[in-house]
Each structure stands twice: as structure tokens, then as C-alpha cells.
Amino acid sequence: HVQVLSDILTALGLDPDAETPGRKVVRYLGTSLVKTMELASRCADPQAAQIVAAECVTLAETKVHLNWELIGELAKKATAEESALLTPAYEQVEREEDEHLYHTAGWTRELWIQALGMPAVLPPPEETRKVDTAIEAAEAKKSRTASAKVTTNTKAKKASAR
């Protein structure tokens, strides 16, 4: 998706490599998320480090998701020439970015649920279903309750059989 944005910027006559205040902030945030994951990997048990990593990825995906929503809004208000560049890129990438966000959020939720000692659904329903929209994500999240009960009952039966 970086290449898609670079191509758009170039076509608009902008330098995709220009150092801007926004670019500096994004770099700082990204570096901070990576350092956070590295710290958790060194200092925490594997389960906690995995949750930290999932949260960091979810934070990053949330920002990327917002950026593509903004590109979509810009495409609606742009000149015809700008819109001709922005709209196809938005349509190509935005749905994939939705999927990334919903899947990472599902993993983060289930890892936390597991860490709190409750029945988790791993992989999460967002991962096992084709979840591309907020409605589909809500339906997948809602379905996890039934899946968690099945998982709990199966584990209980296996434990009592021992």
C-alpha cells in the first residue's frame, strides 16, 4: 500500500520522500510501537508479550484504517483529476485495510480474554470468516459467545475423561 500512495503523490506532483512534520510523527509512533514490543519480549512472559504485540499492531492498523477513510473522503471532494487518482487507489486498498483492522482487533480481544482466564476463541471468528466490514466484524464478534461455550464444554469433557 506504500507503493500505491507513492504513485499517487508522484502523479499529483508531490515528493513522496519529502520529510514532513506528519512523517516525523508517524516514524516516531511506529518506532515507539516496535520498541514497546521489543521491551515486552525481553521483560514479560510470552503470553503478555503476545498481547502487547497484538495491541501495538491494532493501534497501527487503526491509524492506517483512519488514513484510508480520509483518502476516501478526500477523493469525494477533490478535483476530477485528483479524484481519478484517489478513488481507484481507495477502492483497491480500503477494504483490505478494513480486514486488517478487524482481524487484528479480534486477535487482541481473544488473547486478552484468554489471559483473563475466560474461554477464548482462537483463531478469532474474524480470522476464520471473511470479515471485511464493520457489520461483519460485529456479527463475528457476536458469534464468538457460542464458539467459546463449545470450546469450554469440549475442554471440560476432555478433562473429566482423564
Describe each PLM feature range.
Residues 12-15, 46-47, 71-90, 107-118:
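Inter-helical turn/loop segments and adjacent helix faces that build the functional surface
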Residues 1-33:
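Conserved alpha-helical segments that form or flank metal/cofactor-binding pockets of metalloenzymes
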